[in-house]
Amino acid sequence: DYNFSTKNLMALVVPAGDYDKERAILDELEQYDEVDSTLGLSNVEAMGGYMLTDRLTPRQFSELTDLDYEVAEFLYGAYAANHENYGKIVGGLSTYSVPLIDMFLFLYDEVQQGYVTLDDELQSTLDDAYTQMTNAKLQLQSEQYSRMLIYSTLPVSGDETYAFTDTVTAIAQKYYPGEKVYLAGDSTNEYEFEKSFA
């Protein structure tokens, strides 16, 4: 049973744009006994066993979505051109990999603009995926920042909790040296309050 009253939720906010760093942070945090669970774009399953931010090649995307391989390859070429990654177009798209969420959102835009037409079943799958992925992105990422949720087993306040908030911040700083990272939640509020009166 999931009981919200027993969970201590913290939100770790880091610069957006590097799904690999976000996954590494979440993987590292999951190793701590103080962490019950984590949630971020990189550990949300999308479909077919893939996480939202897993990088897929055109072949993998084609197999996952039942999209013709030639259409998937065209789509990846358009994505590469759109992101001015011309070397991938010239060098071959077969090994080019793009995060699943980014490719789905790009495909949705291409369909909306009339560049790609899908059969009804695939269109329905795309519409459902688009709704779920945009909701996840709205909750966990903005233009400048990504948010990762950490559900801790520790109480909201106390020395052990405060030490762990420092650990979480240090882990994030290791992946984003010299950049702003933020940790928010009741524990950090309590910690700041206690430090101000120390």
Positions of PLM-derived features:
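Juxtamembrane segments of multi-pass membrane proteins
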Residues: D1-A81
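Extracytoplasmic
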Residues: D20, G87, G91-A198
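Short secondary-structure transition/capping segments
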Residues: T53-Q60, H83-S97
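Low-complexity, compositionally biased segments
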Residues: Y69-V71, N85, Y130
